[in-house]
Curated annotation (Swiss-Prot):
GO terms for biological process: L-tryptophan biosynthetic process. HAMAP family: IGPS_B (MF_00134_B). The gene is trpC. Keywords: Amino-acid biosynthesis, Aromatic amino acid biosynthesis, Decarboxylase, Lyase, Tryptophan biosynthesis. GO terms for molecular function: indole-3-glycerol-phosphate synthase activity; phosphoribosylanthranilate isomerase activity. It comes from the Bacteria. InterPro entries: Aldolase_TIM, Indole-3-glycerol_P_synth, Indole-3-glycerol_P_synth_dom, Indole-3-GlycerolPSynthase_CS, RibuloseP-bd_barrel. Pathway: Amino-acid biosynthesis; L-tryptophan biosynthesis; L-tryptophan from chorismate: step 4/5. Its EC number is 4.1.1.48. This is Indole-3-glycerol phosphate synthase.
Amino acid sequence: MILDEILKKTREDLKRRKKMLSFELLGRSLSANPYMPRDVIKALKSTPNEPFKLICEIKKASPSKGVIREYFKPVEIAREYEKAGADAFSVLTEPHFFKGDLEFISQIRRYTKMPILRKDFIIDEYQILEALVYGADFVLLIAKALSLKELKKLLEFTHHIGLEALVEVHDKKDLLNATLSGANIIGINHRDLNDFSLHMNLAEELVPLIPNGKIIVAESGLNSREQLVNLNKVGVDAFLIGEHFMRQNDICAAVREMKGV
């Protein structure tokens, strides 16, 4: 299974990084460069003028598609997104399967005040602290990759240091764990991380099961404004879109088309 392979590599990388820089020393670096995270909930809440929000992803590659964007300049892409009216950024930091890098976050943070999601396979508090140090505002927690106990612990730590989390689900069991963990933002991923197949009706099936008061995000396989409008009608507040935008020559125009402006 692809998810298992990614998690194995993540554990190996994490062990190496902890040896290079301890949790304590990583935390101390914040005092030299304090960062105040943005209000992610406010950024993703719909308004009368904006019935849904866009989290625009900065992604070079994926395990299922290989390299998606050859000419890949994270800061340039972020600037195009911001100019087009994006509401937040999602930045891939997983290096082996997605060609990501934590440095992408710090590079982008220098040029924007937009909320940034660290999108990675997070299994340890160390990675969440890294996200804060590098300038992220929220992190991805994948329910499928964590036990309920682990999810609760990581979410509690995330909130403790002032960050927010997008808790990603793919089925009813994931959703139950996300709800029990106290997640404020629940992301419904149409893509099965075990085999990377798409199930495009998933959001419509799971949205009615989500308690009131949560920010609901739909992820993967989204490539038309019609999809967004229809999912917004059933209760989705925001959409995380990556591959569709990464394949465009004119990213700015593609984002504006999705927003209907």
